[in-house]
């Protein structure tokens, strides 16, 4: 699924948006707006389950789910155009590595481990990162992305200079792999499953197998800092309901898939069913509960970015996330 580029101008956009959490919705429920990162998909299923099963209603929350602007959810949430949003630990890093960091905080991990990796057709023979040289790779042209690929290729004995980089924001993985693109960075739970559903034979290399630092959090639920400061009770209520939704989706993948399809009937049923079967096992995985962020893993990735000069300023230890709003 598509990821947006970092929000480079977000700090200059902090005008003109009211805080919707200050308004009571119909029936005296508290209105909260959540900005997605992309069109609805199985990363979001727990949110739709929380709505459909009444968990949000029980918490007194009227949740409005919004599509993101072209720049992604981060800037809109920082501006006060949404109380919550979906982002990624890697792409938001540059916005936090500033004198005035983007005023948002990660309050939950939607998927417990990084499920991204390199995907290619099996007949290309790219069954390890060291075999990527001599092939084409679709790049977002993001420094962090390219540095990670370079590190993994070279650590596996490959010559990164021989990787043919093709700037491309792939939106159709099947079409891309059937064109002049040999390898793509994907999230297996959607694009990897899509190639499986389409009957393609592929090689998939999970990035977390290469470096423990690459087991960062992706995607994450972020919240506006003023919202957290001024209305922590509402933040905790909505997080409790969403957590309940993801726990239910983890335990009932087939029903969860039907709920997502009901909310977004334009989605391909077979893809959603297969993707949900995979991701339902990833929402919580080996964590003690849904959403919890391990500080060591969080800090390890940002430490790697700073060590490799991929951010302008060091991100302080334990900065940018909080587990305090999750159910205790």
Which functions belong to the PLM regions below?
Residues 2-10:
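Sec-dependent signal peptide recognition
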Residues 13-16:
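C-terminal motif of bacterial Sec signal peptides marking the signal peptidase cleavage site
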Residues 18-20:
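Bacterial signal peptide processing site
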Residues 27-159, 164-167, 178, 182-186, ...:
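Short, glycine-/small- and polar/acidic-enriched structural segments
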Residues 44-47, 74, 78, 89-92, ...:
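Extracytoplasmic/secreted envelope proteins and their assembly/folding machinery
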Residues 89, 172-263:
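Pocket-lining segment of extracytoplasmic ligand-binding domains
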Residues 229-308:
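Secondary-structure end/capping motifs
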Residues 298-328:
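Conserved C-terminal helix/tail region of periplasmic/extracytoplasmic solute-binding proteins
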């Amino acid at each position: 699924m598509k990821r947006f580029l970092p929000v480079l101008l977000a700090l200059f956009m902090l005008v003109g948006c009211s805080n919707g959490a200050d308004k009571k919705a119909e029936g005296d429920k508290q209105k909260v707006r959540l900005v997605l990162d992309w069109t609805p998909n199985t990363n979001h299923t727990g949110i739709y389950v929380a709505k459909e099963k009444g968990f949000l209603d029980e918490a007194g929350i009227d949740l409005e789910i919004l599509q993101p602007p072209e720049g992604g959810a981060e800037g809109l949430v920082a501006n006060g155009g949404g109380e919550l949003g979906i982002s990624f630990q890697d792409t938001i890093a540059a916005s936090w590595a500033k004198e005035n960091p983007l005023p948002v905080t990660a309050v939950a991990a939607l998927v417990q481990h990084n499920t991204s990796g390199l995907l290619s057709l099996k007949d290309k023979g790219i069954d390890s990162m060291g075999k990527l040289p001599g092939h084409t790779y679709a790049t977002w042209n993001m420094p962090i992305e390219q540095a990670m690929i370079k590190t993994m290729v070279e650590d596996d004995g490959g010559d990164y200079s021989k990787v043919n980089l093709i700037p491309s924001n792939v939106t159709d993985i099947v079409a891309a792999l059937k064109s002049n693109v040999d390898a793509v960075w994907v999230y297996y739970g959607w694009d990897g499953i899509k190639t499986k559903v389409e009957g393609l034979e592929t090689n998939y290399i999970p990035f977390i197998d290469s470096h423990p630092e690459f087991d960062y959090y992706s995607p994450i639920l972020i919240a506006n800092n003023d919202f957290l400061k001024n209305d922590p009770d509402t933040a905790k209520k909505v997080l409790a309901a969403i957590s309940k939704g993801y726990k239910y989706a983890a335990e009932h993948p087939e029903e969860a898939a039907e709920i997502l399809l009901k909310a977004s009937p334009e989605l391909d049923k077979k893809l959603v069913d297969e993707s949900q079967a995979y991701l339902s096992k990833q929402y919580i995985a080996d964590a003690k509960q849904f959403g919890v962020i391990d500080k060591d893993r969080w800090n390890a990735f940002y430490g790697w970015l700073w060590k490799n000069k991929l951010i302008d300023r060091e991100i302080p230890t334990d900065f940018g996330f909080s587990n305090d709003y999750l159910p205790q």
